[in-house]
Design a protein with these regions (language model features):
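Short, low-complexity disordered leader/linker segments with a strong preference
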Residues: 1-35, 60-61, 65, 108-115, ...
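Short, solvent-exposed amphipathic alpha-helices that sit
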Residues: 47-62, 143-150, 175-194, 208, ...
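Hydrophobic alpha-helical segments within soluble ligand-binding/sensing domains
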Residues: 36, 78, 135-162, 208-210, ...
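Hydrophobic alpha-helical
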Residues: 92-112, 184, 198, 202-266
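Short beta-strand elements at the ligand-binding edges of bilobed clamshell
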Residues: 68-70, 126-153, 167, 199, ...
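Extracytoplasmic "Venus flytrap"
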Residues: 35-58, 62, 66-80, 84, ...
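Hinge/cleft segment of the Venus flytrap/periplasmic-binding protein
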Residues: 32-34, 168-172, 176, 187-188, ...
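Flexible loop/hinge segments that line or gate small-molecule binding clefts
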Residues: 105-142, 261-269, 315
């Protein structure tokens, strides 16, 4: 039999092993695998809020430490945030640029610091190679194409010989504004029935969507056959203005939107919107996976686009599943 001294020795050894094990576990959790600095444009829409929530959720799922900055619609705030990330020596920087131009200086600072940069949702314009490593986001050009393709089918269905369109665009010089506009315009260019009466900047805001629609109705009235709006928030702002002017959206005026948030899908089901092109905000998993690859020195794809679709009055709209944003 073991004596009391032997039991004490064994107990001490077991206790030391337990402490050592706990210490190792603490060490493993103390240092996250990745420190990611992310600058978000703002919280101007349900889409943007959903995008933020998905990135925060993914960071937690992947064990990534997230430094989050809300720019509140200001490029200056975003540039300041990126400089803070550089000073803090994060492993990777990611941001959704509010506009395409004006990033060269701060991104050169990140490059000189050896910090890779990922673009999320939107692209930038630059003549300097190597400032960013990857773009994760929707194919905005194709969203414009899908919107135009629906309109052409709808015009065929209704037998329209002439189609007058007003366009409420997103923030001027932003990637989605430019590419959605280009995709739409290029697709209808070969159809002589299609005429864009005016394009006006709605800044992706519900309030601006209402203001733009009031102006367009005052200017063109019953000449308007179609409203093509670059996001759901502006569309939802425009609808009451259309109704207050005595028109029935979805019937008197064809309504085409982009984002496919839950509120817009509900209005599609009511028949007040005809087409909503999807632009998913759920980019968190792709962002975390890409950032981890960069931290580990792995190659990443230059562009990552999620698969998207259009929801239209041509389909069984009641079968559309909850959107989550």
């Amino acid at each position: 039999m073991l004596g009391k001294k032997a039991y004490k020795v064994i107990g001490m050894i077991l206790a030391m092993m337990l402490v050592a094990g706990c210490g190792a576990a603490a060490d493993e959790t103390a240092e996250p695998e990745l420190l990611l600095g992310f600058s978000q444009i703002g919280s101007e829409s349900a889409w943007r809020i959903g995008n933020t929530h998905d990135i925060e959720r993914a960071a937690e799922d992947y064990g990534v430490s997230l430094m989050f900055e809300n720019a509140n619609q200001s490029q200056e705030n975003q540039i300041d945030a990126i400089r803070r990330f550089i000073a803090y020596k994060v492993d990777v920087i990611a941001f959704s640029p509010i506009v395409e131009d004006g990033w060269d200086n701060v991104l050169m600072e990140a490059k000189e610091a050896g910090i890779p940069v990922i673009l999320v949702d939107r692209d930038i314009k630059t003549d300097i190679e190597g400032l960013t490593t990857c773009l994760i986001g929707a194919d905005f050009y194709n969203e414009g194409v899908m919107a135009a393709e629906y309109l052409i089918r709808k015009a065929d269905e209704l037998g329209l010989e002439s189609v007058n369109i007003v366009e409420i665009t997103g923030t001027e010089n932003s990637t989605p504004m430019r590419q959605r506009q280009a995709g739409f315009a290029d697709t209808i260019a070969g159809d002589e029935r299609m005429h864009i009466l005016e394009s006006i900047d709605g800044d992706f805001l519900k309030s601006r969507g209402a203001e733009c629609m009031r102006y367009l109705l005052d200017t063109y009235g019953d000449e308007i056959d179609v409203v093509f709006s670059h996001n759901d928030e502006m569309t939802l702002g425009a609808l009451p203005e259309i109704e207050n002017s005595g028109f029935v959206p979805g019937k008197d005026i064809i309504i085409i939107s982009i984002d496919a948030g839950q509120e817009a899908i509900d209005v599609l089901k009511e028949g007040r919107i005809n087409c909503v092109v999807e632009c998913t905000p759920n980019l968190g998993d792709e962002l975390m996976e890409t950032a981890l690859k960069l931290k580990n020195g792995e190659e990443v794809e230059a562009v990552i686009h999620p698969v998207e679709q259009a929801f239209t009055d041509e389909m069984d709209v009641d079968s559309i599943e909850p959107r989550g944003y």
